[in-house]
Amino acid sequence: MRSASLILFVAIVALTYARSYEDIKEEIRNEVENEILDDLEEENDELDDNAQEVSDPRARRWRRAFRRIRIRQVVPYIPHIIKAYQTGKK
């Protein structure tokens, strides 16, 4: 969604300030290429991070246990957890 809104914004700016249709096409093409390259770099960084995490079997076990916990199941217990934590304090 971010890419689409960025492209539309650039298209509007290009239409306002461009001298010709070719300038508009070139500007949009450059922005799309830059956005694609940025996304690929982010994905590459994420893949590198995931490769490091996968090598540790204990990390996977904790991550798997954390995924099983659903936020909706935990939310009703949050006030009780806070009260239990604060009971020993003055």
Swiss-Prot record:
It comes from the Eukaryota. Residues 19-59 form a propeptide. One of its GO terms (cellular component) is extracellular region. Expressed in entodermal epithelium along the body column. Residues 1-18 form the signal peptide. The keyword Signal applies. The keyword Signal applies. Keywords: Amidation, Antibiotic, Antimicrobial, Immunity, Innate immunity, Membrane, Secreted, Signal, Target cell membrane, Target membrane. Coiled coil: none annotated. It is found in: Secreted; Target cell membrane. Belongs to the arminin family. This is Arminin 7722.
